[in-house]
Amino acid sequence: MASPKKKLQGLVAATITPMTEHGEINFSVIGQYVDYLVEVQGVKNIFVNGTTGEGLSLSISERCQVAEEWVTKGRNKLDQIVIHVGALSLKESQELAQHAAKIGADGIAVIAPFFLKPWNKDNLINFLKEVAAAAPALPFYYYHIPALTGVKIRAEELLDGIQDKIPTFQGLKFSDTDLLDFGQCVDQNHQRQFAFLFGVDEQLLSALVMGATGAVGSTYNYLGRKTNQMLEAFERKDFSSALNHQFCIQRFINFVVKLGFGVSQTKAIMTLVSGIPMGPPRLPLQKASREFTDNAKAKLKSLDVLSFTDLKDGNLEAC
């Protein structure tokens, strides 16, 4: 894995936690999963135990085991592995942060606690500071996802002077549609070498224009190659091509959102596209319906989003 001092950029797959039909973690497929991300999707950075990975539905012991398996299987294959260590309990977050450092992760990320919430910037920074201090050698990222946490403190406000309080702070996973807030984060901190990682896959091109340095998302598990094509087009200033790639990705996301799209459905799609069994989600989530899977499969076949990927009925080149 890369030096933790290397800036995190490009695509970062928010990894799924594979499970058996009985709801236990299926560690046996993680090595295959790593190879699939690198060799098929061209994605070499991962974000473990986040929303997509059902991190907050796992026990502390399970989260440690999952993190360790990804680090072990990703060694010399992945560039950077960031472990989400957020929890409702400060002590649990600190324990997870210490474990991430012990196993050789490249960074840690934390969401705001969302039951007994911090109601202002100072409260939130005090919490984040204590977690970061538990792993003082690791880069620290704030995971901003107000729609799920209910913590409405603007990221722009949080970033103001944050390195004075948290010296290891290196960036932000911004999972919100407020592009004004995101843009101000970039604009007011452009002299700092922060990683600005956008977390709304269907809006990534807009965020790139505003200065995003990378992206963390669930769709990069199975649409990583297509999204990388968009990044490459943007980099060479072929904005028309980049826009076409984004629109193509949006057509699929828009379709599945209308059907009902979340972690359960992400697992079903990843199983379908990769051939690696992701299993069901953990309760209270329910397994995606067969109707959803059939409809998603048909939509994937109708769009130019798949290259060198296998569906159940055989190899499917770009359709």
UniProtKB/Swiss-Prot annotation:
Main subcellular localisation: cytoplasm
Enzyme Commission (EC) number: 4.1.3.3
Keywords: Carbohydrate metabolism, Cytoplasm, Lyase, Schiff base
Active site (catalytic residues): 143 (proton donor), 173 (schiff-base intermediate with substrate)
Name of the featured protein: N-acetylneuraminate lyase
UniProt source species: Sus scrofa
Activity's dependence on pH: Optimum pH is 7.6-8.0.
Oligomer and partners: Homotetramer.
Localization per record: Cytoplasm
Keyword match Zinc-finger: no
Role according to the record: Catalyzes the cleavage of N-acetylneuraminic acid (sialic acid) to form pyruvate and N-acetylmannosamine via a Schiff base intermediate. It prevents sialic acids from being recycled and returning to the cell surface. Involved in the N-glycolylneuraminic acid (Neu5Gc) degradation pathway.
Catalysed conversion reaction: aceneuramate = aldehydo-N-acetyl-D-mannosamine + pyruvate
Top-level taxon of the source organism: Eukaryota
